[in-house]
């Protein structure tokens, strides 16, 4: 089954959106496999966003991510990477549809509440970085009510 990495950024944590965001993924039928509240240092944030290191907004992004605790999560389910991105909404909240997390809770691109893996391969890399200890192996008793 496919897995994705989801991070509630410092603004989402500070604004008390953790439960709401977790609820959206649970209600969709995805299974939470890993969860931690953590404040990361600059080196870790730079490693996570290394693919963006040449962008002019890189330093501001890193400063933002290290400004407070984040909630790092691993979610599992059929098509969870693609569907997770749809639940999250467009990177720019002003382009996000109402009903998406960013469409409902964010205004500025620099405070867009949440990160989600953009592909299966990036999800694997991000999960390995954030959860080197591995994640929980379990199956919900609702699995047969969600999947054929």
From Swiss-Prot:
Which superkingdom is the protein from? Eukaryota
List the Gene Ontology MF annotations in alphabetical order: ATP binding; metal ion binding; nucleoside diphosphate kinase activity
Please state what the protein is called.
Nucleoside diphosphate kinase 1
- Please name the PROSITE patterns in this protein's record: NDPK, NDPK_LIKE
Question: Which residues carry out catalysis?
Answer: 115 (pros-phosphohistidine intermediate)
Cofactor annotation: Mg(2+)
Catalytic activity as recorded in UniProt: a 2'-deoxyribonucleoside 5'-diphosphate + ATP = a 2'-deoxyribonucleoside 5'-triphosphate + ADP; a ribonucleoside 5'-diphosphate + ATP = a ribonucleoside 5'-triphosphate + ADP
Which residues make up the binding site for ATP? 9, 57, 85, 91, 102, 112
**According to the UniProt record, which cysteines are disulfide-bonded?**
none
Family in the record: Belongs to the NDK family.
Q: Whose protein is this, by species?
A: Nicotiana tabacum
Protein task: Major role in the synthesis of nucleoside triphosphates other than ATP. The ATP gamma phosphate is transferred to the NDP beta phosphate via a ping-pong mechanism, using a phosphorylated active-site intermediate.
Per the UniProt record, which EC number(s) apply here? 2.7.4.6
């Amino acid at each position: 089954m496919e897995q994705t990495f989801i991070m509630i950024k410092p603004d989402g944590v500070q604004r008390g959106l953790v439960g709401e965001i977790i609820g959206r993924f649970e209600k969709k039928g995805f299974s939470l496999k890993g969860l931690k509240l953590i404040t990361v240092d600059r080196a870790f944030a730079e490693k996570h966003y290394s693919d963006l290191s040449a962008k002019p907004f890189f330093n501001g992004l890193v400063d933002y991510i290290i400004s407070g605790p984040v909630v790092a999560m691993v979610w599992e389910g059929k098509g969870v990477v693609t569907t997770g991105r749809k639940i999250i909404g467009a990177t720019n909240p002003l382009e996000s549809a109402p009903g998406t997390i960013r469409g409902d809770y964010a205004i500025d691109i620099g405070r867009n509440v949440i990160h989600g893996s953009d592909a299966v391969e990036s999800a694997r890399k991000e999960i390995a970085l954030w959860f080197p200890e591995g994640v929980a192996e379990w199956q919900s008793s609702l699995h047969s009510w969600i999947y054929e």
